[in-house]
Structures are given as structure tokens and as C-alpha cells.
Amino acid sequence: MVQGKGLTGFILAIILLQGSLAQSFEENRKLNVYNQEDGSVLLTCHVKNTNITWFKEGKMIDILTAHKNKWNLGSNTKDPRGVYQCKGSKDKSKTLQVYYRMCQNCIELNAATILGFVFAEIISIFFLAVGVYFIAGQDGVRQSRASDKQTLLPNDQLYQPLKDREDDQYSHLQGNQLRMN
């Protein structure tokens, strides 16, 4: 029982130390990204030097004075991507990768996304086929209606005779021959 409490205390101490280590690493960052309300993206360098040099993709962009330690990347709609770094005369920051995905309704097509679409399509076609099979496979037995039982013509009279007409256009069956009564 005593060993179990000691092991639990040891695991708890390790977890707490990892949290404090992560917090101390976060506090030591010298390069931060800020997304402004107007849509612009700012990089802030926290090195204590008079001259700050900005780098993008390893190439120098600009040299600023110490009280101008912010670099405006422009509007986030213009897709400010890249690997940025700031460097003072004595120390330099770690690299920071900035990536904005501006298409809010877009889907990034990778293998997992395409596989998901194909799988969903196959499943939906399967359910549709099962539904059609069960609906079409039912026997045609239906309840008879009153209109099905109603006779429209009496049984003894299959055809209605033509009325006698004198010399009208439709009083003749063939050609110009008159109809005899």
C-alpha cells in the first residue's frame, strides 16, 4: 500500500514538473504573432538590442531600431506565410512559421479527406439500393377501390351505335357512299 502511494506521488510530481517546464518555455519565446482587429498580422520580437534584423525564409528583410520591434506582415487576407526570425546583435529568436488559411469554406484535400468522401458515397449508395430493393420488392397486392368495381358500360352493350344523320360529313363510314338504314 505504501509503494502505491509513493508511485502515485512520483507520477503526480512528474506531471506537474512537465507543466511548469512548458510554461517556462512559453515565457522564453522571443518572437510572437498577434492578429489585430483590423485584420493585420504583427510579429513582435523581444530581444534586448538596439538593432533588430528581421529574416524571412533565411533572407534578411529589414533592420529596425529597438523601440520598433514589431514587423507588420500586412492583411491576413493576403496570406502572409513564411518562416520568420528576428535577430539582435547578441541573441536571436527561434524560427517561427506563420501560415494563414484564408479560404474559410475550403477543404484541404489530402488522402484522408478523399478517402472519407469515397467511403461516405459508397455507404449512401448502399443504403439507397437497400431502400429501393425493399420498396420495389413488395408484392403488388393493394386494396380495391369502389371505382375499380364500377362498370362504365352495361355488359350487353359493348359499343354505342352511331346516330342516323342525313348527309353530314361523319355519317359515312367509307368514301362517298351514303349510309343505308
UniProtKB/Swiss-Prot annotation:
Extracellular topological segments: 23-113
> Which positions carry Phosphoserine?
144, 147
Q: Where in the cell is the protein located? A: Cell membrane
> Residue ranges of the ITAM domain?
148-176
One biological process GO term for this chain? regulation of lymphocyte apoptotic process
The molecular function terms of the Gene Ontology recorded here are:
transmembrane signaling receptor activity
- Segments in the Cytoplasmic topological domain: 135-181
Regions that span the bilayer: 114-134
Q: Where is the Ig-like domain?
A: 24-97
Please provide the record's keywords in A-Z order: Adaptive immunity, Cell membrane, Disulfide bond, Glycoprotein, Immunity, Immunoglobulin domain, Membrane, Phosphoprotein, Receptor, Signal, Transmembrane, Transmembrane helix
Against InterPro entries, the record matches this protein to: CD3_esu/gsu/dsu, Ig-like_dom_sf, Ig-like_fold, Ig_4, Ig_sub2, Phos_immunorcpt_sig_ITAM
Instruction: Identify its membrane topology class.
Output: Single-pass type I membrane protein
According to the record, the signal peptide region is 1-22
PTM comment text:
Phosphorylated on Tyr residues after T-cell receptor triggering by LCK in association with CD4/CD8. Phosphorylated also by PKC; leading to the TCR complex down-regulation. Phosphorylated on Tyr residues after T-cell receptor triggering by LCK in association with CD4/CD8.
Q: Where is this motif: Di-leucine motif?
A: 152-153
Question: Per the UniProt annotation, where are the glycans attached?
Answer: 51
Q: Which domain of life is it from?
A: Eukaryota
One GO CC term on file: alpha-beta T cell receptor complex
The UniProt entry, under Pfam families, shows:
Ig_4 (PF16680), ITAM (PF02189)
* Disulfide cross-links: 45-86
Q: What is known of its domains?
A: A di-leucine motif and a tyrosine-based motif are individually sufficient to induce both endocytosis and delivery to lysosomes.
Description of how the protein assembles with itself and partners: The TCR-CD3 complex is composed of a CD3D/CD3E and a CD3G/CD3E heterodimers that preferentially associate with TCRalpha and TCRbeta, respectively, to form TCRalpha/CD3E/CD3G and TCRbeta/CD3G/CD3E trimers. In turn, the hexamer interacts with CD3Z homodimer to form the TCR-CD3 complex. Alternatively, TCRalpha and TCRbeta can be replaced by TCRgamma and TCRdelta.
Q: What does this protein do?
A: Part of the TCR-CD3 complex present on T-lymphocyte cell surface that plays an essential role in adaptive immune response. When antigen presenting cells (APCs) activate T-cell receptor (TCR), TCR-mediated signals are transmitted across the cell membrane by the CD3 chains CD3D, CD3E, CD3G and CD3Z. All CD3 chains contain immunoreceptor tyrosine-based activation motifs (ITAMs) in their cytoplasmic domain. Upon TCR engagement, these motifs become phosphorylated by Src family protein tyrosine kinases LCK and FYN, resulting in the activation of downstream signaling pathways.
In Swiss-Prot or TrEMBL terms, this protein is called T-cell surface glycoprotein CD3 gamma chain
Species per Swiss-Prot/TrEMBL record: Macaca fascicularis (Crab-eating macaque)
